[in-house]
């Protein structure tokens, strides 16, 4: 008997599939894993020896193994041997054959069998006979069905459809600007979406898109009912027409649907701090609050009235016309105006999307809400003015009968009634005539009370709105009232009062802000951006700041304080201790000295910076010529920032020494600090290069100021005396001791014009000043003063050379950003000495100014003694310079 039609192979165990216990040892590789030769047609397998029951010894192949090389054999090997026991595809293939066979006519494996209890009931199978007839092989549909079932055995169609997923997303809050602002982050929005999913079926989030569109639709129906229903009740007798019935049916249906949806919509508690999504809590909360009002306003009174109307004859209907008052239950829909708050929240969402300001949005919404409420009350009052006489069958002393308007059209009646109501509410009259009946008198008083209340609310809201739109001006006015009371209390003269008034006008310009509080509430990056935008250009005009670290400049900007000075005010006075430096944002100041010499400084200039380091006394006075808006920087804040940037402190000190040297003064404190840093080896190559560039650009700035304005605070200095080579060598040695990297002499037109500096004569022929002949012609004003001038591209037309470090952007050193410093009017202005125009061509870069040792060794107008014999007699120049510097300190 063929094994395919029999009940099973002799000796084969019914449970051929391993149980989910410890897996048996892997059997030897089956022959189908080796590439078999093309087999001949397989003969029908006859009964053979039974395969062993022990899994490790299951090496004998069944008769159908001869077909493994064919197409169905390859397909079966891909499907894990057609569900043979012990293969992964057994479960899926066992149910893939419609005739009870495993894909190609083999007996299917069914549960139960002797080996089942030993290996587990879920995976033990027994072979049962197949139905008669040929069995088709496994087709693509069977394989697709097997794969669709999945490893977890999920049935087809278990996932939600696309439409269901889309509708479910409408019930959840979307990821948009409004949701992100309400919940804080996208992660919080996703958590809220998970809350909606876990809350139950058909739970609507109050911030979902579905609820938004539904509320907007209900708002339209609500406005329509609040306007149309009073008109229909009052001015129309026949309410059984088709349009009226359709409107009532549609509106009542939507109100009932809204009543049901409110039981499934989350409730926002305590200013959006908590959202209730539990169905039980939603139901209890809604029943305790707005359910009664919504239910009463949603009762289909129209249907009940139409049903009752058909059973009443005409006579009874005339007497029952007063039942129309029942339609006033729709007026309870007025309480639905409280849902306008939800509309306002979504209007805010639209405003944020279109980048509208909050003040404009709140102003528009408050005005629109107030005007809409007043118009709605006027509409209701007009309907009430005609409804009461109508219910009384138009007595002779009512305003309708007096004017003979009983049979007029409803539009004329409504117009006169609305005019009468608005006259009462605005308290401007009684309409066409004064009330005569007692009913009209009471209606008039009621209208006046409602109108006065609305008028007061409108005035209050409008006043608060105007104040909120310009709170800074209101704050300024309140502050100035206090100032006026102060001046009156102290009986100040009229000129003082006018001066104080002008100061407040220019200082605050009609608006007062608490700038410190506003900036203090912002985060650090935003505050720095605002400060940089307001005044960084002013500070960047300084060479020290232009070549400084941007972080240092930002730290300095946060310490600035805004001040305003009037014409004639002395900002600083000569002889006082300097505690501030100033940056001019707008205005003109004059720098005055004892010699009555003036120098004008305007927008972008600065003065008083040397005193930040020395805390010395002012050498000049600064007076405001116009209204000046300045930024001040105190010495304490300046030093606080310099503690974090020691290199910038050394740069400030070096520039201060150079400036003092140019005006013929010195400061022992700064000299001691620089000498200490020099001896301790604090200066490195990069810092020294940065400081050299700062000093160079500071000198070039003074040079450009001298070219543009020859008038200074002092007369032109005398020409520098002739010097010997020994003194020049000492000067170079002193410069090398201050900065070891500098091995070339200091040259420059400014240094030649200084009475304290000496110059080594250029090699070659003697300068023209020493010859008895006429002096050489001066350079034209537009020509560069020296070969170094063409390289100073920030002031010329050539490109600037790259600076020594990454913190030295040459583009910041433009001529426009180099205003004159107020500490430099003390510099000797005037035409440079004769040697300035005959300066030799040299490629050396100007370095720091001469050290105090060089100044001590060099002859000057202040010191007429000769050079030190030690310096001229061949002593070490560096030792001589350092010894003299120590003696000066």
UniProtKB/Swiss-Prot annotation:
A Pfam family the protein falls into: Ion_trans
UniProt note on regulation of activity: Activated by cAMP, and at 10-100 times higher concentrations, also by cGMP. cAMP binding causes a conformation change that leads to the assembly of an active tetramer and channel opening. Binding of cAMP removes a tonic inhibition conferred by cyclic nucleotide-binding domain (CNBD) on channel opening. Channel activity is modulated by intracellular chloride ions and pH; acidic pH shifts the activation to more negative voltages. Inhibited by extracellular cesium ions.
Cellular component per GO, a single term: plasma membrane
Annotated TM spans: 216-236, 241-261, 289-309, 318-338, 370-390, 441-461
Sequence segments annotated as region (Involved in subunit assembly): 158-209
Glycosylation sites: 407
Annotated GO biological process: ammonium transmembrane transport; cell-cell signaling; cellular response to aldosterone; cellular response to cAMP; cellular response to cGMP; membrane depolarization during cardiac muscle cell action potential; potassium ion import across plasma membrane; potassium ion transmembrane transport
Modified residues (Phosphoserine): 146, 161, 668, 754, 771, 779, 786, 866, 868
Catalyzed reaction equations: Na(+)(in) = Na(+)(out); K(+)(in) = K(+)(out); NH4(+)(in) = NH4(+)(out)
A single GO molecular function term of this UniProt record: molecular adaptor activity
Tissue: Highly expressed throughout the brain. Detected at low levels in heart.
Record annotation: effect of changing residue 632 to W: In EIG17; gain-of-function variant; affects channel activity resulting in a depolarizing shift in activation and faster activation kinetics compared to controls
Ranges of Pro residues composition bias in the record: 17-55, 760-784
Cytoplasmic side: 1-215, 262-288, 339-369, 462-889
Effect after changing residue 126 to L: In FEB2; affects channel activity resulting in faster kinetics and increased current density at higher temperature compared to wild type
Compartmental location: Cell membrane
Intramembrane segments: 414-435
Protein family per UniProt: Belongs to the potassium channel HCN family.
Domain notes: The segment S4 is the voltage-sensor and is characterized by a series of positively charged amino acids at every third position. The ion-conducting pore region is between segment S5 and S6.
Record text on subunit structure and interactions: Homotetramer. The channel is composed of a homo- or heterotetrameric complex of pore-forming subunits. Heterotetramer with HCN1. Forms an obligate 4:4 complex with accessory subunit PEX5L. Interacts with KCNE2.
Protein name: Potassium/sodium hyperpolarization-activated cyclic nucleotide-gated channel 2
UniProt gene name: HCN2
